[in-house]
UniProtKB/Swiss-Prot annotation:
Thalidomide is teratogenic in human, chicken and zebrafish, but not in mice. Binding of thalidomide and related drugs changes the substrate specificity of the human DCX (DDB1-CUL4-X-box) E3 protein ligase complex, leading to decreased degradation of endogenous target proteins and increased degradation of other proteins that are not normal substrates. This is probably the underlying cause of the teratogenic activity of thalidomide, possibly due to abnormal regulation of the BMP and FGF8 signaling pathways. Disulfide bonds: none annotated. The lineage of its organism: Eukaryota, Metazoa, Chordata, Craniata, Vertebrata. It is found in: Cytoplasm; Nucleus. It comes from Gallus gallus. (S)-thalidomide binds at residues 380, 382, 388. It comes from the Eukaryota. The gene is CRBN. Belongs to the CRBN family. This is Protein cereblon. Zn(2+) binds at residues 325, 328, 393, 396. Substrate recognition component of a DCX (DDB1-CUL4-X-box) E3 protein ligase complex that mediates the ubiquitination and subsequent proteasomal degradation of target proteins, such as MEIS2. Normal degradation of key regulatory proteins is required for normal limb outgrowth and expression of the fibroblast growth factor FGF8. Maintains presynaptic glutamate release and consequently cognitive functions, such as memory and learning, by negatively regulating large-conductance calcium-activated potassium (BK) channels in excitatory neurons.
Length: 445
């Protein structure tokens, strides 16, 4: 996505842009700003024929990147000193892909040094961006890399992936300006099965998913099968003082199935085989595609158990009814029913534009209260075959994302919206305390 995000949107996105070539004809002085007329009338297509593997490959970065194999994992609870990549304002989730375009000599030099070592750097989760305050973060490992020169400027293009959560112990700045973070690697607490205390080990083997599991979620046969499976799995609850449904609230397998039902509502073509089977990896996959603000995301990042994380995610998915403009707060932009997936990563993924700004972009069928600015362009499109047009909040003018329109009539969907997470505020009903005062949303842990 090119950096033509509008004035305010460009200023709020972090890194200063590098020198750029002369503007193209698509960016002439006759820039349009019109109210979108067909955002509300858009309908879900019967089928999607777009290649969902294209966005995840980040082909706009180039196809001749040097790839690395293997992975670097640090011991749980160990203390490590890891360099911090400056200007990266993303709250990275383990397993999430992070594309980067780096122009600053300091960043280019740092990445070159990392390539010669373990290719790992720290991404800080800023709880207060203005004060540059961070107590948590995620290690990121480079798995693809390319150097090039454009207009006399050395640039580095990188694809990295989030690995492990950490707690920040200390941050020091070297003489060359690079920050070094002393961190403690946070472990994943694996909780035992809810029935392990009352169930014989020989009986637990019988509760593995049988091969006869129906594959169609909306099928009546699946619901019947699931009820029988749950009854058999938690039958030992009769030996305790608690009912079976209480145990199911803390059962990883049951929580994963409930979350999958929500994911299938977002993506009717979703195949269970494409999702991680490990509860830890699955919980991170879901966390990375939830359209929540940083306040909620850092709550997820702090949680050290997949079961607690899944419960929190399920609570968010059930409570979040719509998404509003973060600046206006009351201007509704879209609802959760309009979310769909156009990528193998899910409905939301991180992308980077030519000026190095990273946007975690959510795909939706319909959006409202938006104005379109500028002309459609296919340059640097994150979704090959689609042209993008800048979208701004109709009330405050805040940059919200882009409208994507197909360049060919046989493509489906013909149009959709890509909304940037940093501009969205999830609408979650606030609880009230005993005095009737509003409180922050309390997520189910």
């Amino acid at each position: 996505m090119a950096a033509e995000e509008g004035g305010d949107g460009r200023r709020n996105m972090g890194n200063p842009p590098p020198p750029a070539p002369a503007e193209s004809e698509e960016e002439d002085d006759n820039e349009m700003e019109v109210e979108d007329q067909d955002g509300k009338e858009a309908e879900k297509p019967n089928m999607i024929n777009f290649d969902t593997s294209l966005p995840t490959s980040h082909m706009y970065l180039g196809s001749d990147m040097e790839e690395f194999h293997g992975r670097t994992l640090h011991d749980d609870d160990s203390c490590q000193v890891i360099p911090v990549l400056p200007h990266v304002m993303v709250m990275l989730i383990p397993g999430q892909t992070l594309p980067l375009q780096l122009f600053h000599p300091q960043e280019v030099s740092m990445v070159r040094n990392l390539i010669q070592k373990d290719r790992t750097f720290a991404v800080l989760a800023y709880s207060n961006v203005r004060e540059r305050e961070a107590h948590f973060g995620t290690t990121a490992e480079i798995y693809a890399y390319r150097e090039e020169q454009e207009y006399g400027i050395e640039t580095v293009k990188v694809k990295a992936i989030g690995r492990q959560r950490f707690k920040v112990l200390e941050i020091r700045t070297q003489s060359d300006g690079i920050q070094q973070a002393k961190v403690q690697i946070l472990p994943e607490r694996v909780l035992p099965s809810t029935m392990s205390a009352v169930q014989l080990q020989s009986l637990s083997r019988r509760h593995i998913f049988p091969s006869s599991k129906p594959k169609v979620w909306q099928d009546r046969a699946f619901r019947q099968w699931w009820q029988k499976y749950q009854k058999r799995k938690f039958h030992c609850a009769s030996l305790t003082s608690w009912p079976p449904w209480l145990y199911s609230l803390y059962d990883a397998e049951t929580l994963m199935e409930r979350v999958k039902r929500q994911l299938h509502e977002w993506d009717e073509n979703l195949k269970d085989e494409s999702l991680p089977t490990n509860p830890i990896d699955f919980s991170y996959r879901v966390a990375a595609c939830l359209p929540i603000d940083d306040a909620l995301r850092i709550q997820l990042l702090k949680i050290g158990s997949a079961i607690q994380r899944l419960r929190c995610e399920l609570d968010i998915m059930n409570k979040c009814t719509s998404l509003c403009c973060k600046q206006c707060q009351d201007t509704e932009i879209t609802t959760k029913n309009e979310i769909f997936s156009l990528s193998l990563c899910g409905p939301m993924a991180a992308y980077v534009n030519p000026h190095g700004y990273i946007h975690e972009t959510l795909t939706v069928y319909k959006a409202c209260n938006l104005n379109l600015s500028g002309r459609p362009s296919t340059e640097h499109s994150w979704f090959p075959g689609y042209a993008w047009t800048i979208a701004q909040c109709r009330i405050c003018g805040n940059h919200m994302g882009w409208k994507f329109t197909a360049t060919k009539k046989d493509m489906s969907p013909q149009k959709f919206w890509g909304l940037t997470r940093s501009a969205l505020l999830p609408r979650i009903p606030e609880a009230e305390d005993e005095l009737g005062h509003d409180r922050s949303p309390l997520l189910c842990l």
